Amino acid sequence: MNLFLITSAIHTNYSNTSPEDRLRETIDTAESIKKYAPDSKIILIEGGKPLPQHIKDRLSIFNEIFDFSDHPVMQMTQSDAQLAVDNVGHSVKSAGEAYILKEALKKIDGTYDRIFKLSGRYRLTERFNIQDHIHKDKYVFLPKAPTDKMNMIDADAKTIVTKSSIDFSPWRYETTFYSFDNIPKAQMIFEYIFNSLVETYSEGNYIDIETATYLTINKEDVIEVPVIGLTGVLGMDDRSIDK
C-alpha cells in the first residue's frame, strides 16, 4: 500500500483564499488521490489554526488527521518566521511544514511501499504514473529549478545562513509533490531542515524549504522525473501550474 501525506493549513493568516474555499480544495486533493492512486491511505497533516469539529466532520474522506495546529512549536515557528516576513514581504511557511512532516513521520504505523508528500489544495492528474516513483531508497522530484531571488538576502556574501551549515544555492527542488520510501532517513532530513530554518529565521535571514531541501538531500539519493502529474494554483501568485 502507498501512503499520501497531505500538508494543510485550512485556517491561516497567510492567504487571501477563504477557509471555506481552502477546505473544499483540500477535499478535492483527496478525491484526486482516490481517482488516480486508488487503495492508497491518505493522512491530512494540519498545521493551521485549530479546526472546529464541524470542519473535521467534513474531512471524513481522509483516513486519518494529524492535527498540529495548537502545538506550541508551531506558534514559536510562526513567531520566528515573522522576522523573515518583515525582510522579504513574503509569508514564511517553510519551517512549519518541515516540523509537521518530521512529527507526522513519528506517528505513522505500518509499512508502505511508497510515501507521497502532497501539498493540500493541489490535485493529481491523469499524467500521474506511480511507476515513475518505484525507486528503492530514492526521493523522486521534478527536475531541480533555479532558486527564487528572494533567497538572495545577502547577495554580496553569497550566503543565506550564517550558522546553520546551509549556504546559498542557485537551485531548489519543488516540494509541492514528491515521494520517498525510507521513513527513518526522511525523518532525519526533515529534522535537520526544520532546525536549520528556525535558526535562519531567528537570525533575521531567509531561505525557503525548497532550497533547503535541495541543499540537504544527497543528490545520489534523488531521481528527477520530467512530469509528475500535479495541478493547482499557487497560493501567493494565483498562478496555475500543471506539471
Regions found by a protein language model. Name each.
Residues M1-K243:
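ER/Golgi luminal nucleotide-sugar-dependent glycosyltransferases, focusing on the catalytic module
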